[in-house]
Amino acid sequence: MRVVYLVLVVAVIIAITEAKSVKKSKTRSPKHPRHRTLADDYKLNRISAKYCKDYDDSCKAFGKIAKKDKKSCFNNPDKARMACPVSCKLCDKKTFHKKSKLSDVVVVRAMCVDIEVDQCNPDVCYTNPDWATENCRKTCMLCKPDIRGPCDTDPRCPFWGQYGYCSTATYIDNHCPYNCDVYSYVPEAPQPYPLPIEPLYAYQPLPYPTAPPGVTPATLPPYYENAPQPTYAPGAQYPAATAAPAPSAPGATAAPAPSAPGATAAPAPSAPEATAAPAPSAPEATAAPAPSAPEATAAPAPAPEAAPSEPEAAPAPAPEMAPAPAPEMAPAPEAASAPAPEAAPAPEAASAPAPEAAPAPEAASAPAPEAASAPAPEAAPAPEAASAPAPEAAPAPEAAPSEQPMPGKKSKSKPSKRKGVKKSKSGHKRHH
């Protein structure tokens, strides 16, 4: 038993030692770095300026793709390093620096030439500033041509020097030693540079400089003909003063606003005056207000549903019109039995053509729907017409029973039938 126990212990020890040796061999084996994105190993992806070139025609479009897109430089590090290092901004800066007396000022001394002559143009100075300051110093006017001397480290230095911004900010004075020296005679700008000078992050495009209004730039040095400027307009994220004309627009609209209601109030009283004139006229006047009826249809549409005609006359005309129709409605007993109180002005219109008793029932049937559809405008002049023919109202009661036999008989026939029913009922009772 002891021998078996010792054999097991030895086997376990051997297994443990072999496992440790395997782990050591794995740790010593070299690991190949896996670059998922450019941000993971940004320092390892930097390429020296001598070999930093674009080898593909589609690199410009490839470098402008957004960072979140799967086809961007960040998500395709192999293509960015091998084919498009310039457009993806992977070029390394290796220049000779000499510190001046001020610890925060760095003066770059290098040969002022264009290393990549084919790719250097005015647009590159602003679209890819890091690469342009190393490979396109002459095109971007960052130093004196063909001489080793101080060089600017920002492509906007020529613009800042021409307009006198060198002494307005320490960043401009420190990063633009050449152009600030060339344009030292230019007076200081009245205001500091309005746009942001330093980018918020490494891949943020620089805002294109725009000349201030009313300021002329200084003349260029004799060895430069044209200043580097982009061929397209500046970015829209820095708009001009568009808020100035905005307050003037509401002021112009506010002025005609009060005039509009005044213009509508003027023709309002003129309309009832025109209707008051044809009211006392012959039945020809009924044909004249026919076109005016559709205009009033919009107002009296809710009137028959609301039943009372007095609330309609109260808000539209003056308060004097409210008591006028009240006495006319009281003596008319037929108005209560009639379907609507609007029938009150109907007998007044019929009182004028008294001799024409024969066509009276036809006229009563025709204007009945018209009076219901447009009573609002005719109700206003009703009291005025009644006040004028006051003496003629005396013969009116004689014509009333002759002209209105039909409506009167219909109203009286109902109680007469009821009496007959009672008699018949009483007669039946007697027979029983």
Swiss-Prot record:
| GO terms under cellular component | extracellular region; nematocyst
In the record, the note on similarity to other proteins reads: Belongs to the NEP3 family.
PANTHER family associated with the record: KERATINOCYTE PROLINE-RICH PROTEIN (PTHR48148:SF3)
Q: Residue spans with biased composition (Pro residues)?
A: 314-330
**What keyword terms does UniProt attach to this protein?**
Disulfide bond, Nematocyst, Secreted, Signal, Toxin
Q: What does this protein do?
A: Probable toxin.
> What's the protein here called?
Nematocyst expressed protein 3-like
Q: Where is this protein chiefly located? A: other
Q: Where is the composition biased (Low complexity)?
A: 235-313, 331-408
Cysteines engaged in disulfide bonds, as pairs = C52-C91, C59-C84, C73-C88, C125-C140, C157-C176, C166-C180
Q: Which GO terms describe its molecular function?
A: toxin activity
- Signal peptide, first to last residue: 1-19
- Locations listed in the record: Nematocyst; Secreted
Domain of life assignment:
Eukaryota
Expression tissues: Nematocytes. In late planulae, transcripts are found throughout the ectoderm in nematocytes, with high concentration of expressing cells in the oral pole. In primary polyps, is expressed in nematocytes in the body wall and physa ectoderm and in the upper and lower pharynx.
Which segments constitute the ShKT domain? Answer: 59-91, 107-143, 149-183
Q: Does the keyword Glycosyltransferase apply?
A: no
Q: Where is the composition biased (Basic residues)?
A: 409-432
Identify the species of origin.
Nematostella vectensis
Is-annotated flag, keyword Secreted?
Answer: yes
Q: Where is this region: Disordered?
A: 235-432
